[in-house]
Amino acid sequence: NIMVTKQALETSNANLNMIQSRYNSGFVVKSDLLRAMVHIADLEQQHLLAESRFKINEAMLNASMGFGEANPLNPVTPLTIRSEIHGTVDTWIDTALSKRPEMDTLRLEEGIAKKEIAKSQSGHYPDVSLIGNYEINSEDFGDSADNYTLGAVVRVNIFSGNRISEETKAAKSMLARVQEMQKSMELGIKVQTREAFLKAKSARERIRVAKIAVDQAEEGLRIVKNRYNNGLLTIVGLLDAELARQQAHTNYFKALHDYKVARVELELAAGTIDTDFQ
């Protein structure tokens, strides 16, 4: 993380100035100064590596979006908690089952299959048609009719060579396949949504714990720095405190990142993600 390594470098350089001052005054040995310099060199390598990874990821993202590799990216969404997760896992599952477009497609296919069954079965039923005829026998236009005929025609399919039964069987088979796909899709959506919900909840709790660890690491470094400055602690203790602080910040930002990703996965699973998502 570029921000974490940059912050760690600033802290280590400040501590190096303190160690240099104590060395010049004869309070610490040269090995302390050298250890601090080695530590800073290691942090500089970490910072350069973080910057390199960022540029590589930026180029890959540009390529995936069809932009030029050198196109600068300016993220507009900060790595902070912008919204909490509300509702229970069952609520999210119900939303997913009603919002996911895949389920809408299968429900539409189910309706079509049922209509095909009804259509094929209608071939067994009699077909009734009404006919009529109306004539006016006059040289002039008039309001009365001299002749009219009304009738009905009934057609009964006595034998179709099992054609209708086969059509019905095929339609029922299609309905069974669609309903089986619905069950499988529904189960998959439930599992996916539950997993995304639990991951988001876990990441949110990790943020809380990581924030406490950051505060503790900051306070620990302050205490250790004062003790070292007063000659009550070795350079090893100071460097360990710096590393603990750096790791605490890394864990905190990783938890924030994981929560963001989990939120996206949850919204995708529920079928509710849109361009306004943050």
What are these regions (language model features)?
Residues N1-M3, S21, H39, N57, ...:
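Amphipathic alpha-helical coiled-coil segments
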Residues N1-T95, A196-K199, A203, R245:
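Periplasmic alpha-helical coiled-coil/stalk elements that build and connect Gram-negative outer-membrane
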Residues A50, P101-E102, V178, A255:
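Metallo-beta-lactamase
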Residues R53, S122-H124, R155-F159, D258:
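Structural signature of outer-membrane beta-barrel channels/translocons
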Residues L61, A152-V156, A255:
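Residues on the lipid-exposed face of transmembrane beta-strands in outer-membrane beta-barrel proteins
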Residues W92, Y148-V154, A196:
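Hydrophobic, lipid-facing positions within transmembrane beta-strands of outer-membrane proteins
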Residues D104, G123-L150, I158-K169, L175:
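Small/polar (Gly/Ser/Thr/Ala-rich) solvent-exposed segments
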